Amino acid sequence: MDAQGDAGAQGGSQGGPRPSNKRLQQTQAQVDEVVGIMKVNVEKVLERDQKLSQLDDRADALQEGASQFEKSAATLKRKYWWKNIKMMIIMCAIVVILIIIIVLWAGGK
């Protein structure tokens, strides 16, 4: 009985590691799969970070360009406003001179 008991105990322990070993292999395969997925995810996150960085650089450049455009537009607006004022002053001066000439010419007759 002792020999059978020992053999039964060994047989039970031999049968035990095999399913446990299979479970370990399945678990390891799942872990490997998860590691692979996580590596892909990390690569995607790094690519996304790089793209976001490039987008941020573009946005900064665009903001700088918009600011420069705004300054140029304001300067141009002032320039043409003064040109318009000068033209109106010249036209008013011409009208005043014409009125003076007409008054003097009419007064001389």
Swiss-Prot record:
Region Disordered, residue ranges: 1-26
Entry-linked Pfam families: Synaptobrevin
Effect of loss of the gene: Worms exhibit arrested development after embryogenesis. Viable mutants appear lethargic with sporadic jerky movements and absent M3 pharynx motorneuron activity. All mutants are resistant to the acetylcholinesterase inhibitor aldicarb indicating impaired cholinergic transmission.
SUPFAM superfamilies for the chain: SNARE fusion complex
Subunit structure: Part of the SNARE core complex containing ric-4/SNAP25, snb-1/VAMP2 and unc-64/STX1A. This complex binds to cpx-1/CPLX1.
Role played: Involved in the targeting and/or fusion of transport vesicles to their target membrane. Acts in neuronal exocytosis of synaptic transmission. Likely to have a role in cholinergic transmisson. Required for viability, coordinated movement and M3 pharynx motor neuron function.
Protein name: Synaptobrevin-1
Source species: Caenorhabditis elegans
